From Swiss-Prot:
This is Spindlin-2C. It comes from Mus musculus (Mouse). Keywords: Cell cycle, Nucleus. Residues 136, 244-246 are annotated as: Histone H3K4me3 and H3R8me2a binding. Residues 48-97 are annotated as: Tudor-like domain 1.
Length: 257
């Protein structure tokens, strides 16, 4: 059984992110600067699959040191990388070569383990499914989080992307181990839910690369971009907001219907 999510500790070290979200999302037109940005970034040597280390300096806070694995480079914004940092359960989206808060970025000689999943059939079974994920809370209590398994993670193939109702950001765990230990349970599918292998009615194509505007409960707005569509659930997308390094996961059909 795992301890609670380590996102909170990461926010204290890397700067405060935004917590739970209740609001509305509006799709905006894509800006024209994307093509120039892609041409500048494409000349760099690929660091996907590499182990990295760097310092992090934000405002007057002391410098902290980070190590992690580069999981992916976002095609719609090649300067943006998805990174799994050691000891942190959520996936971060950072412009590793551009973000001024990142100090002394180094490519480490460490080898990344490319071991595959131990049970392919079980992996295919849990992807796209609503689940209940058990964590160990304070004083040994059990804390149950409802969420959805989104995909097998790139590079670290024994890990899976997952998001949760109470915290809709991108996490990754070794879920097959959790399933076999009884800490991950697949929830019964609702008769109203569409099959996982069929696009639900109302899915909007072509949202990747679109700019979004999010209105929070207090009326304030934040902007971001749709960077990925979840294959197992085509109505679900990853969004990277301009003011946050977390990757948010939204059902845009549900949000905009």
């Amino acid at each position: 059984m795992k301890t609670p999510h380590k996102k909170g500790a990461a926010k204290e070290q890397m700067g405060e992110g935004v917590g739970h979200h209740i609001g509305s999302t509006t799709i905006k037109k894509k800006k024209a600067s994307q093509k120039r940005q892609r041409s500048r970034s494409s000349s760099r040597r690929s660091i996907v699959g590499c182990r990295i280390s760097h310092g992090w300096k934000e405002g007057d806070e002391p410098i902290t040191q980070w190590k992690g694995t580069v999981l992916d480079q976002v095609p719609i914004n090649p300067s943006l990388y998805l990174v799994k940092y050691d000891g942190i359960d959520c996936v971060y989206g950072l412009e590793l070569h551009r973000d001024e808060r990142i100090l002394k970025l180094k490519i480490l000689p460490d080898k990344v383990s490319f071991s595959g999943v131990s049970d392919v059939r079980l992996a295919n079974t849990i992807i796209g499914k609503a689940v209940e994920h058990m964590f160990e809370g304070e004083h040994g209590s059990k804390d149950e989080w409802r969420g959805m398994v989104l995909a097998q993670a790139p590079i670290m193939n024994a890990w899976f992307y997952i998001t949760y109702e109470r915290d809709p950001v991108l996490y990754m765990y070794q879920l097959l181990d959790d399933y076999k230990e009884g800490d991950l349970r697949i929830m019964p599918e609702s008769s109203a839910s569409p099959p996982a292998d069929r696009e639900p009615e109302g899915v909007v194509d072509g949202l990747i690369g679109k700019h979004v505007e999010y209105t929070k409960e207090d009326g304030s707005k934040r902007t971001g971009k749709v960077i990925h569509q979840v294959k197992a659930k085509p109505s679900v997308y990853f969004i990277k907001f301009d003011d946050d390094f977390h990757i948010y996961v939204y059902d845009l059909v549900k949000k905009n219907s």
